[in-house]
Structures are given as C-alpha cells and as structure tokens.
Design a protein with these regions (language model features):
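Active-site beta->alpha loop and helix N-cap motifs at the rims of alpha/beta catalytic domains
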Residues: 64-122
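Catalytic beta/alpha-barrel core
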Residues: 119-130, 144-151
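Anionic-ligand binding region
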Residues: 151-168
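Active-site mouth loops of central-metabolism enzymes
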Residues: 16-27, 93-104, 148-152
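Conserved small/polar residues in nucleotide/adenosyl-binding loops
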Residues: 175-180
Length: 192
C-alpha cells in the first residue's frame, strides 16, 4: 500500500511540511526533513527548484532561486531522498514543475521516483488533459499523482480529477467571500 493512502486512512488532521530541496544550502534537505519529522510532520513535500515557479509565492520563489544558485539538481534530490529513506518511512512527495521532468524524460523520472521510494508527485502546471498517461504510469508504480482543484473547478472536472488522482487531492483555497471552504467542500467526492 502507498504510504500516502495509509496516512490518510484515518480521519485525523495531518501536518504536511514543504521543504525546497537545496535550500538554504545544497546539503541541508536531509537534515531539514528529519527535523520536520521529529517536530511532528506526518508527510513531507520536497520542492524541486525551478527557474520560473509561477504557481508559488515570493518566499518559495526566493528559495527556488537560492537552491538553483546552490547548484542542486533533480538527480541529487533523488539521491538525498534515498538517504532520507534509510531513516524514515514518512510519506514523501515531490512537488515541482513539469519542465524538469520532461527534460529528464517521464519514464526515467518515474523510475527514479520508484527507486527513491517517493510516494507522490505534484505538478501544478501539468495540464489535466495531458496528464492521463503520466498519472497512470505513476499509479502503476504505486506513486500517487496529487492533483489540484480550486473553488471554481467545475463538477465535471472535479470528477475527472478524482478518477485520475492517486490517494490525495489538493484543494487550493482562494481568499474570497463567502468562505472558500464552503465554495467547494460540499462538491468534493467522498472518496476518490
């Protein structure tokens, strides 16, 4: 069973911590992950630094810039996760942008995720209609594709996302009124 599915098998609240790989220095990722877990993190997202992180806010954009200046690479991130896996079974997801995965090749990326025991992959810029094969290939390796929905996502699209996603769907909240939660929570399928 995928560790993400196992984690979310209970209804308790979960603490998911995001860490940009290679920030504040190239070799700090492992220590930051292990300290986050000691501090109570139930799951870790490791951000893959990218030169144009348009879906991220200014803090993560700056962390990406520093990590890239530090010289972190996707291959090094996989090696760091392998080292982390020697010390913990906490679920780990990679979060990034599709361009570095395309450059590596999707099959090679998925193989490296599997080899490093990555549990999930989040790619906010991968268009849903272009993600079917990629998501299915992830699921074939027991890796959860983690897809996103927003308050303005249509019912039809939510159903498509829930069928394609793995064991977790991200609900992006917009700062609107009435409560963003009320705008979409009632529309989410009870099980994906």
């Amino acid at each position: 069973m995928n560790r993400i599915k196992e984690l979310f098998a209970t209804d308790s609240k979960k603490l998911i911590v995001f860490i940009t790989a290679g920030f504040p220095n190239k070799d700090s990722t492992k220590n930051l992950v292990l300290e986050a877990i000691k501090g109570g993190a139930d799951m870790i997202e490791i951000g893959i630094p990218f030169s144009d992180p348009q879906a991220d806010g200014p803090v993560i954009q700056e962390a990406n810039e520093i990590a890239l200046k530090n010289g972190i690479t996707l291959l090094e991130i996989f090696e760091q996760v392998k080292e982390i896996r020697k010390e913990t079974d906490v679920p780990i997801a990679l979060m990034g942008y599709y361009n570095p995965i395309l450059r590596m090749g999707t099959k090679d990326f998925i193989k490296k995720c599997n080899d490093a025991e990555i549990d999930g992959v989040i790619l906010p810029d991968l268009p849903l209609d272009e993600s079917v094969e990629f998501c299915n290939n992830l699921k074939n390796k027991n890796i959860s594709p983690i897809l996103l929905v927003a308050p303005n996502t249509s019912e039809k699209r939510i159903k498509k996302i829930s069928k394609l996603a793995g064991d977790l769907i991200y609900a992006c909240l917009l700062y609107t009124s009435p409560s963003p939660r009320d705008l979409w929570i009632s529309r989410m399928p009870s099980s994906a």
